[in-house]
Regions:
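Short cysteine clusters
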Residues: 126
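Conserved G/P- and acidic residue-centered "switch" motifs that form tight phosphate/ATP-binding loops
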Residues: 129
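Ser/Thr-glycine-rich phosphate-binding loops at phosphate-binding pockets of nucleotides
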Residues: 133
Length: 183
């Protein structure tokens, strides 16, 4: 079983393209008895404190849907993040899928780049920190000017070979700047 004590929350950092930092992680505080990587019983308070104090996070970007927050026993994530000094932002995306609203993704990616340019630290999370977090992290890198191969290499270095997880997510990241510019 993975807990906040046995497996402290870590962040996979994207390349240093800005004075600030942007990273990817799994859902803080999650309770997931049948997770693919084993059982998770985490402490939300410990995870949020570690994100703030050890990793220097100022912004927490949550990509989970409402039902996932309930299922993972972190329905109060927004309030708890704020009480730990984190600015909380959300863009719910269906698990294993791509974002429904291109405009919302473009705006979020630009905001994250702006925060990092202003020496702030943002941490993006989904359930496991690979699929949806990797997709949005990839869009941030594409917005910052990286080409698709460099973006995928940076995501692999940050979170591993399955980041983003699906072909649909990888294609979304690959085509993001061209599609965003056309709209």
């Amino acid at each position: 079983m993975r807990t906040s004590e046995t497996h402290p929350i870590e962040v996979g950092w994207l390349p240093d393209l800005w004075p600030g930092r942007v990273g990817l992680t799994f859902a803080p505080g999650k309770h997931q008895p049948g997770g693919l990587s084993g059982a998770w019983v985490r402490d939300l308070e410990l995870d949020l404190k570690r994100l703030r104090t050890v990793h220097g996070a100022q912004h927490l970007v949550c990509l989970l849907e409402d039902h996932e927050l309930v299922k993972l026993a972190i329905a109060d994530l927004a309030q708890r993040a704020k009480s730990n000094g984190l600015e909380f932002h959300r863009l719910p995306i269906q698990d294993g899928s791509i974002p429904a609203e291109l405009g919302a993704v473009r705006a979020l990616a630009q905001r994250i780049c702006s925060w990092a340019a202003a020496r702030q630290t943002a941490v993006i999370h989904c359930m496991g920190g690979l699929g949806r977090a990797g997709t949005i992290g990839g869009c941030v890198l594409r917005t910052a000017g990286l080409d698709a191969p460099a973006t995928f290499e940076a995501l692999r270095e940050a979170r591993g070979v399955k980041c983003p997880e699906t072909n649909e997510q990888r294609l979304y990241v690959q085509q993001f700047t061209a599609v965003a510019a056309a709209h």
